[in-house]
């Protein structure tokens, strides 16, 4: 799939077929994440690939109460992306690990789409039960949870703002 086609076609998928994901596809997706740029090349991320059905069920249970939790039920794989904030930059009151995780997660999300798969990036959850379940070390943050699978839905595109409402030329200007 061409790059700009991937960007235009990517959607948040919340319904999945239960078909297994070929390892070659999964390998390319994870490689896309591995190659993501990061602050000072620190690569503060770590990935937990949850394939075991009973572990995915337990993950779904600890996500209970999250409005996005139901997306895990049929996805054959869930990827949890973690970050070590101390292994990324902090400058001028900005913590760069969140930017690093945003970049690596978007690389992964686009690769998922390019492979003909679907995913939903879930970022709102209580991380303590997830850390306990997956034995994530205390210094790491669980930042993103991504169920992955073959889509069992084709959502329409969400409305996007027009570029001319987002872009300023040379300096910020008040819209009239």
Where are these regions (language model features)?
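Absolute protein N-terminus
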Residues: 1-3
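C-terminal helix-cap and adjacent tail motif
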Residues: 5-13, 18, 22, 144-176
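Alpha-helix/helix-capping structural signal
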Residues: 11, 54, 125-128
């Amino acid at each position: 799939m061409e790059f700009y086609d991937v960007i235009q076609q990517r959607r948040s998928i919340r319904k999945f077929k239960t078909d297994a994901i070929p390892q070659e596809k999964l390998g390319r997706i994870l490689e896309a994440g591995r190659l993501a740029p990061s602050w000072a090349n620190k690569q503060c991320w770590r990935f937990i690939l949850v394939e075991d059905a009973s572990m995915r069920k337990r993950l779904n249970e600890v996500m209970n109460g999250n409005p996005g939790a139901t997306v895990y039920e049929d996805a054959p794989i869930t990827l949890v992306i973690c970050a070590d904030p101390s292994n990324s930059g902090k400058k001028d009151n900005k913590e760069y690990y969140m930017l690093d995780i945003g970049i690596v997660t978007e690389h992964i999300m686009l690769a998922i789409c390019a492979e003909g798969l679907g995913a939903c990036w879930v970022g709102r959850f209580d991380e303590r039960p997830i850390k306990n379940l997956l034995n994530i070390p205390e210094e790491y943050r669980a930042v993103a949870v991504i169920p992955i699978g073959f889509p069992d839905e084709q959502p329409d595109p969400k409305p996007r703002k027009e570029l001319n409402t987002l872009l300023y030329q040379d300096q910020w200007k008040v819209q009239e």
